[in-house]
UniProtKB/Swiss-Prot annotation:
SUPFAM superfamilies: Mannose-binding lectins. GO terms for molecular function: carbohydrate binding. Residues 2-147, 150-294, 297-444, 451-597 form the Jacalin-type lectin domain. It comes from Arabidopsis thaliana (Mouse-ear cress). It holds the Pfam family Jacalin. Signal peptide: none annotated. Keywords: Lectin, Repeat. InterPro entries: Jacalin-like_lectin_dom (IPR001229), Jacalin-like_lectin_dom_plant (IPR033734), Jacalin-like_lectin_dom_sf (IPR036404). Gene3D superfamilies: Jacalin-like lectin domain. This is Jacalin-related lectin 48.
Amino acid sequence: MTERLEAEGSRRGNNSKWDDKSDHDDVTKIYVNYSLSGIESIRFDYVKSGKPKDGPFRGQSYNTYTHTFEINHLKYEHLESVEGYYTEDTGIEALQFKTNLRISEPIGYHHDGCTKFILAVEGKKIIGFHGSSFALRVGSLGAYFTWDTPTIIKAVGGKVGTKWDDGVNQAGFTKIHVRSGQKGIQFIKLEYVDKDGNLTDGPIHGSIYRRGSPHVFEFKHDEEYLVSVEGYYEGDEECEVIQGLQFRTNIKTSELMGSNTGKKFKLTASGMKIVGFHGYAEKNLSSLGAYLTPLTPKKSECKGITDGSNVWNWDDGAFEGIRKVSVFFTALRIRCLMINYEDAGKVVKRSHGLNNNDHQEEKFVVDYPNEFITSVVGTMSSSSVMPLIFKTSKGRTSKQFGDYSFDDSVEFVLESKGCAIVGFHGWHNPVSGYMTALGAYYYPMPLPPAAEKLEAQGGAGGAPWDDGSNFQGVRKIYIGTGEVGIVSIKFLYENDVHEIVVGDHHGNKNLLRHEEFDLDYPSEYLTSVEGSYDVVPGSEEYEVIIMLKFTTNKRTSPCYGLDDDPIFVLHKEGHKIVGFHGKSSNMLHKLGIHVLPISNS
């Protein structure tokens, strides 16, 4: 439902009223013509039913400055609010626009005699404007708001059973309960915190009246959110059943709940988080779909002095990333902060403070998009912020900018787990120019890529197994050998929270002795596996693995098993091995790998 906020501004009698109406999907571009006297004309472009719609200029202008502000609705950006200043005599003097991702520069000029106004409705976006104009002035401005509807990914799988929909009232998930059985996922149940902050148990979707394997995935809703679901489904058309599910947050990945048989699917979208689920269920979970909303930057509080008549506020808003930070400082003060931001392929420069020739300049260049600033360490006193140190996602640390601390100085850190700093805001003294306070905007860093599964090599016999891909690397390999070659294998992994994970034995579990290949983890990692396979006594007509040899970034292992020339290589250029899968009985029939890109850090 559309909500109209009345126009704010001058009520002069000869105002000419105008109305762009509310039948639009989004605002896409704003043009503002302004002078020292105020905002003289304004124009809004929209998108309607997926097609662009250019609006007319409202007001008249002559010999003005022009500012444009583009909103990328294709990247789920939308206009949330407008802040402005006006007087009764001159109308709108200054404007600033805020989207769910960033803030425009202040447009125009205002003074102490102006009245401030804000056009905003919590949880809604602007889809149209109305207002009035007179004599080379925009007199007033109002807006139309509507709910920002989530993106829907349709349910994947069958349509057997009852259609269910948990909606989008969740502020964050806390637990996901899944039970798997021989015929697939039996049920799914979600626990979450609603938008009022209440812990809520969602209903069970599926059946609880059979035996199965329970799985629970728990996470902290205040810092963790769901970014994707991978799964498998199989069955006749319209009667498919979900066979396995795996959930991924911005911090960690769940185990595979169920099996990886059938067709693979993925519920995800770049730059978005999952806020709800829907699907079909009866005796089993037939299908699963999701609701998603855009991830939004989080604004920190300012550290330092933020009140008093001698300090002014500044706010850059949030961008895609930071390319360079220049700090101008003397022995006692940081006088100016200059930041080069990344904005859709363009560099946007912002400067705050007093930039003259009586100070030292130091620069810190970031290798964007491969590197992000993740934290700022500084000290604050009763009069200023000084010194500053910047740290990045690659583990780099800048030099210390400034070296003097006052007796009352207190250290502070601007940092949010799993996030990059994508913007700054703060306060400075307009006379001396020195910084008095600093804050940041945080945005989730791009997720590390999901591991790629390379096809297993070997014979056709045995039962399938998969250690999974939720690891950072391989620490140790146990190889069981016999007269016929490789009869068993086991791997020791390390996960993303530095826990050691012991994989299952694959092959003959009764061997008393194994050969071992130790890696100097984390500096050493697996890059390839060579092997061969053949029919041997006891394997019937099936081929089994008879030789394996492992190569790391530092060395090559001995040849395990029979002395045979390799007939296959498991390898992908620029990648490391982080997991294994294959087939086995009382012998090893087949071996495959999961790989991740090698990080330069």
